[in-house]
């Protein structure tokens, strides 16, 4: 790839929809600012539960193909042109929830050799030369096998890429500060009677919640076009998500807030100043900051 923009962001996710829920504001912001945003999705989510009755017939490869189309629609909403499947379509299958027999499928991501899968991601890193990599924490946010493997693959790829002379300057994990999500759920409980959802999720249902002091970086989107783009991207994943702003449900039908500020923990690289960063590229030589770190 030639003529790369000055800022290059790589995100690694397990299934279509994970990127929009976790990073929709972030992706929309950096795409709009002219950064090169690359999304690598590890599986097509063929074993996901389908919400709309009209699409309930979809399963397996048919569901995977449909979700690939949803992903393309979501990327259009976010303004992202570079989105790929790890190893190409069908290379790795959805593993299903932990403890199911699906985990034993030799073609699923859970059974993948991490070094072999990471080598495929290194090829992407060598091509796009990202300064920033975003993925999950070691538990994958909430313990799904594909999320755990996506974390392992991304972190191993960062190591291998550095050994190959293509280091990634900063690596972040998706996080949510406990105080923020507690406040959001308090508002949700007040709003629930007026919503098309019967029950609310709890703080324990939100992936990646940590104590506030673990948060190093926040990307704000309240009241911006980036927040609107995130909601539109989430709506595009209609088999998996029902949106009633500022809330949504997954197939468990438990309402939770759409987070229009997205939070991160820097786990590799140098922090860009004191206090919380508000730019993933803060402090990286050869890029420009769009804001100062805040307390």
Swiss-Prot record:
Q: Which UniProt keywords apply?
A: Hydrolase, Metal-binding, Zinc
* EC number of this enzyme: 3.5.1.103
Catalytic activity annotation: 1D-myo-inositol 2-acetamido-2-deoxy-alpha-D-glucopyranoside + H2O = 1D-myo-inositol 2-amino-2-deoxy-alpha-D-glucopyranoside + acetate
The cross-references to Pfam families, in alphabetical order and at most eight, read:
PIG-L
- Top-rank lineage group of the source organism: Bacteria
Keyword flag ATP-binding: no
Q: Name one GO biological process term.
A: mycothiol biosynthetic process
What InterPro entries does the record point to?
GlcNAc_PI_deacetylase-related, LmbE-like_dom_sf, Mycothiol_biosynthesis_MshB
Task: List, in alphabetical order, the Gene Ontology terms for molecular function in this entry.
Answer: hydrolase activity, acting on carbon-nitrogen (but not peptide) bonds, in linear amides; N-acetylglucosaminylinositol deacetylase activity; zinc ion binding
- Write down the Gene3D superfamilies for this protein, in alphabetical order: LmbE-like
Tell me, using the record's free text, what induces this protein: Gradually induced by thiol-oxidant diamide, under (probably indirect) control of SigR.
The entry's Zn(2+)-binding residues are 15, 18, 147
Q: Which SUPFAM superfamilies match?
A: LmbE-like
Q: Is the keyword Metal-binding assigned to this protein?
A: yes
Q: How is the cofactor bound?
A: Binds 1 zinc ion per subunit.
Needed cofactors, names only, are: Zn(2+)
| Family label | Belongs to the MshB deacetylase family.
PANTHER family, per database record: 1D-MYO-INOSITOL 2-ACETAMIDO-2-DEOXY-ALPHA-D-GLUCOPYRANOSIDE DEACETYLASE, N-ACETYLGLUCOSAMINYL-PHOSPHATIDYLINOSITOL DE-N-ACETYLASE-RELATED
- What does this chain do? Catalyzes the deacetylation of 1D-myo-inositol 2-acetamido-2-deoxy-alpha-D-glucopyranoside (GlcNAc-Ins) in the mycothiol biosynthesis pathway.
Name the record gives this protein:
1D-myo-inositol 2-acetamido-2-deoxy-alpha-D-glucopyranoside deacetylase
Q: What is the scientific name of the source organism?
A: Streptomyces coelicolor (strain ATCC BAA-471 / A3(2) / M145)
The coding gene here is mshB
